[in-house]
Amino acid sequence: MSRLKKYNEFINTRVGFFSLLIGLLWLKNMFAYVVDFHLSIQNPMQLFILLINPLSVSMLLISIGLFIKRSKVAYTTLFIIYGILSIWLFSNAVYYREFTDFITINTMLGAGQVSTGLGESAVRLFRWYDIFYILDLFALPVLLFKKKIIVEEKHPRFRKAAALSALSLLICSGNIFLAEIDRSGLLSRQFSREYLVKYLGVNAFTVYDSYQTFQNNQIRAEASPNDLKEVKSYIREHYAEPNDSMFGIAKGKNVVYIHLESFQQFLIDYQLTDENGVNHTVTPFLNSLYHGESTYSFDNFFHQVKAGKTSDAETLMENSLFGLNQGALFTQLGDKNTFEAAPNILNQKAGYTSAVFHGHSASFWNRDKTYKHLGFDYFFDSSYYDVNDDNSFQYGMHDKPFLSQSVQYLEHLQQPFYAKFITVSNHYPYSSFKNDEDGFPLATTKDETINGYFATANYLDTALKEFFDYMKASGLYDKSIFVLYGDHYGISNTRNKELASLLGKDSDSWTDFDNAQLQRVPFMIHVPGTTNGGINHTTADRSMLSLLCCIY
């Protein structure tokens, strides 16, 4: 009984009322994480981060009321800020049910353009359990009015209010620190709004999104048409006439892009020696393509990505544009810019239907919005596939079931089509596979990441062979050309010295030049029916977009 009395006495203080609001908001966030957002937890660190991330911004904002001397104004301020944060969380929960995404500043700015009919649509998204989000917004004023919660007239000391605000900043700093440990580059790469909410919370994500939106608007405001003069002048001066022997050799054929995740050039023709001294070819199928007479291969092709990683590679290949110096173009500008991208060009010039296939969340790298601006007609994300724990991991569906299940959608695309398949199995941390897929030997270095890299690359290779076998059996093979490219490095420079021995080099004599050479990734254009292919040693020439245009 004494404990209950002490609790009631504490709640009847301003700090106690503040603590009650923080506790209720924390519970609502936990409820939303589990019931509406379905945020996945892979390790104890992520669980701890998820438990603390609703606190920082909430505590900082609600604590504003503790600095106000007049009691009624103070309590009103505390409750209003709490109410706004509760409604904002509820709004995100409802929005997520329809769009599997979170509300951004740009979403709100554009809401007026599609406001007609939104009211009825939103009502249909409500659930019976939504009462949990809003019940206390009615109950707390009643409890205050009936003096079940007493308004404390005494103003808390400035030090106490400041200490609570400082605690919120400390939690925020710790939250970001732990998030960067568990997910390096979270803020700089900005690859997924879901990841940002998972690691930072809804409110912190909104603050971060507001800053990014302001920064992007400033950059756009400073842009001038005069900036293009130098670019246009350079293009005119360096114009290259099409090669008559190659121009138009693939006219009217389907285009199939295959995005090789984290695949480096040194894997081509590489043989891994196991602990018994037996050599195992890592990529026999890709080797046969690479050296085939119908493939135009490039062995000096360097990835050119930064924080955007995979999305930067897509930006480059689709538009002949580099990514951003900071952050990812897909997430910052993908749903705002107007692009002259390959899907658009092929549709306008030759009536191509375009589609992207990817067994991961549509919002990852902001793909669902960016692809529309690139001109893609369809985007088949994870919601179109039978994804389960056995055939997927944290970055999406494994390549074999992904490519196999993609066939049903590819078959129904109107020809000629432009289709891109984004594979993910050869992705860090390069873990071994379950069941019958766990067969290729691991390397035996001290670095587990390097050890698994060859096995996942081999899995990708066998998945591609199965896909090409299907294309041949269906009759689509001879009607298509295939563009295969590695998006970026798989083994980072910090691990290269450990990799050196597997490449026949001495780690003690490893240089920056060796690091640079490992930034090469495969690039092949396979054109069935041609016989004048080969390996090109071009160092820097035309972009993928210009090469594609030349053979069409």
Language-model features, listed with the residues they occupy:
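Transmembrane and membrane-interface helices of multi-pass
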Residues: 2-211
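Low-complexity, intrinsically disordered short peptide segments enriched in small/polar/basic residues
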Residues: 8, 12, 225-228, 478
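Glycosyltransferases that elongate glycans
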Residues: 65-69, 74-75, 81, 229-232, ...
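Short coil/turn linker and secondary-structure boundary residues
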Residues: 103-109, 223-226, 540
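Exposed alpha-helical structural elements
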Residues: 113-114, 230, 285
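Conserved acidic functional residues
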Residues: 200-214, 262, 479, 496-497
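Membrane-anchoring hydrophobic helices of lipid-metabolizing enzymes
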Residues: 210-233
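Solvent-exposed soluble domains appended to multi-pass membrane proteins
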Residues: 233-552
